[in-house]
Amino acid sequence: MIIDTTEVQDLNSFSRLESLKEVYGIIGMFLPILTLVLGITIGVLVIVWLEREISAGIQQRIGPEYAGPLGILQALADGTKLIFKENLFPSRGDTRLFSIGPSIAVISILLSYSVIPFSYHLVLSDLNIGVFLWIAISSIAPIGLLMSGYGSNNKYSFLSGLRAAAQSISYEIPLTLLCVINISLSNSSSTVDIVEAQSKYGFWGWNLWRQPIGFFIFLISSLAECERLPFDLPEAEEELVAGYQTEYSGIKFGLFYVASYLNLLVSSLFVTVLYLGGWNISIPYIFVPELFEINKVGRVFGTTIGIFITLAKTYFFLFISITTRWTLPRLRIDQLLNLGWKFLLPISLGNLLLTTSFQLLSL
């Protein structure tokens, strides 16, 4: 039997080509995820640096200045130090719950970034239930805090976990009602559709102007969800030492801080998406994709401009959150729950009823 060497070479080249296609397919599948994770990491490092600089300015002192230019590498240095610290475990605690808690808190928040549009159709997963997915995922993080508090076998940690769960339930309901209002205004629960619905009318089409009361309630509720001052009752140092973080050290201790800043960033991004038109350039009847959709280079430039606009709006609200933390005193636990159940929830419910009534009358 004679085998043609040309046919064998063709078969080998074809198999190599198919293998390269599979490799490129795998790289193409994971590249957006890796890019998003890298961007989130850089964003968190910038937030940590901004918080240190803003707090130093408010307190009239010098902030970090030795680790890199203007101290911009201080957060990276702190993270590196925590990685090499020893991981201690409570002798009588539940080791499994103690170890799983920080991971659940971080992973549940990271999943929320998959539905956030950073520019025109620049989103990891454009789901029809994007907003509801964020609400569902954000309710998982307090479970991790409760597991950490229970697994620590410490009364302060356990009480902190209970506070985190109670605070989350109290402020997730107003958040959900406000998200339903935005969904009804846009006729879609997709984050991309909500941004495009606001982009049709430029600056005055933002939900900020159509729902000003809802915007302020959303801002307050998102701060409470992030457990930031004046709502950091689960970590109240004067009452609970360090809350659910009391028994932690090393990288697990650092994961809680990462989760806090990740949650703050994702909340600010959702404020931008739901109320500030996302990547909208704020010129009436013109938005980024129509302005730059001339050729391939124009589309890349338009996408870059959209990312810049989204991040500029996001970091504006991060500045507000950081300033609020360093200027307002902490609430008591009874004041926190009263604010959520007796004020924000009734106002959110009334706002929902009024909005839906006007929409039904306009049909």
Curated annotation (Swiss-Prot):
Listed transmembrane segments: 30-50, 104-124, 129-149, 248-268, 300-320, 343-363
Gene Ontology cellular component list: chloroplast thylakoid membrane
Compartments, as annotated in UniProt: Plastid, Chloroplast thylakoid membrane
Keyword Transport appears in the UniProt entry: no
UniProt topology in membrane: Multi-pass membrane protein
InterPro entries assigned: NADH_UbQ_OxRdtase_su1/FPO, NADH_UbQ_OxRdtase_su1_CS
Reaction it catalyzes: a plastoquinone + NADH + (n+1) H(+)(in) = a plastoquinol + NAD(+) + n H(+)(out); a plastoquinone + NADPH + (n+1) H(+)(in) = a plastoquinol + NADP(+) + n H(+)(out)
GO molecular function terms noted in the UniProt entry: NADH dehydrogenase activity; oxidoreductase activity, acting on NAD(P)H, quinone or similar compound as acceptor; quinone binding
Pfam families reported in the protein's UniProt record: NADHdh
Superkingdom: Eukaryota
Keywords: Chloroplast, Membrane, NAD, NADP, Plastid, Plastoquinone, Quinone, Thylakoid, Translocase, Transmembrane, Transmembrane helix
GO annotation, biological process: aerobic respiration; photosynthesis, light reaction
Enzyme Commission designation: 7.1.1.-
Coiled coil: none
Subunit structure: NDH is composed of at least 16 different subunits, 5 of which are encoded in the nucleus.
Family: Belongs to the complex I subunit 1 family.
UniProt function note: NDH shuttles electrons from NAD(P)H:plastoquinone, via FMN and iron-sulfur (Fe-S) centers, to quinones in the photosynthetic chain and possibly in a chloroplast respiratory chain. The immediate electron acceptor for the enzyme in this species is believed to be plastoquinone. Couples the redox reaction to proton translocation, and thus conserves the redox energy in a proton gradient.
Name of this chain's protein: NAD(P)H-quinone oxidoreductase subunit 1, chloroplastic
Encoding gene, per UniProt annotation: ndhA
